[in-house]
UniProtKB/Swiss-Prot annotation:
Protein's cellular compartments: Secreted
GO biological process terms, semicolon-separated: defense response to bacterium; innate immune response
This protein's name: Defense protein 3
Pfam families: Attacin_C, Attacin_N
Signal peptide positions on this chain: 1-17
Taxonomic classification: Eukaryota, Metazoa, Ecdysozoa, Arthropoda, Hexapoda
UniProt organism field: Lonomia obliqua
Function: Has antibacterial activity against both Gram-positive and Gram-negative bacteria.
Keywords: Antibiotic, Antimicrobial, Cleavage on pair of basic residues, Immunity, Innate immunity, Secreted, Signal
Amino acid sequence: MFGKFVLLAVLLVGVNSRYVIIEDPVYYIEDHELPEQWTSSRVRRDAHGAVTLNTDGTSGAVVKVPIAGSDKNIVSAIGSVDLTDRLKVGAATAGLAIDNVNGHGASITDTHIPGFGDKLTAAGKINLIHNDNHDLTANAFATRNMPSIPLVPDFNTVGGGIDYMFKDKIGASASVAHTDLINRNDYSLGGKLNLFKTPDTSVDFNAGWKKFDTPVINSNWEPNFGFSLSKYF
C-alpha cells in the first residue's frame, strides 16, 4: 500500500511538470497548456525568442529558428529552458515545428525534466477562423512520458484545447489533458492582454488558472500570472 502511494505521488509531480508554449506573440502558462502552440499563429520567417517571468517565481526562455521552407510552409528548430523559483533548471525542450501560411501547424519535441525523465510530444493545430478581428485555433497533443525512476513504467498523456484572439490584442484559451496510468485529468484556463507591440517586439500580460482531479486527489483552481517579452530578429 505504501509503495502504491509513493508511486502515485511521484507520478503526480512528474505529470504536473510544465509544458512549454510559444505563440506569436508568446503565451506561456504552466502545466498542461498545449505544446503544439510552438507553432506560430501565422508563418513568419524570422528567428525569434521570448522570456517569461511568473508571479510564482518561475521563469522561462524559448527560441525558434527557421531552417527550411517554401512560400507556404516553414520548418523551424525550437528549444526552451524552464527555471524554477530557485533558478534551477526545471525542464529543457528541443524539437522541430512546421508552420503553414494558413495558420495550421505541427511539432515534435522532447522535454527532459531533471529528477523525472523525458517526455516525447507530438502536437498539431488547425486554424478555424482568421480575419481582422478574430482568430480561433483548435489544437491537440499526445505525449509519451518516459520516467527514469525505478519501477515507474512509461505512460501516456493526451489533450486538446482552443485558443482565441481578438484584434491580436486580447486572448483566451481553454484546455484539458488526460493521463492514463493514474487516471488524472488536468484543466486550464488562460487569458492574455497585449501591452505593447511593434513589428519585431511584443510585451504581454498572461493570466492562468489550473486544476486537476484523480480518483483519490482533487485540487482547487490555482492562479498564476506573468509577463512575457518576445522578440523577432
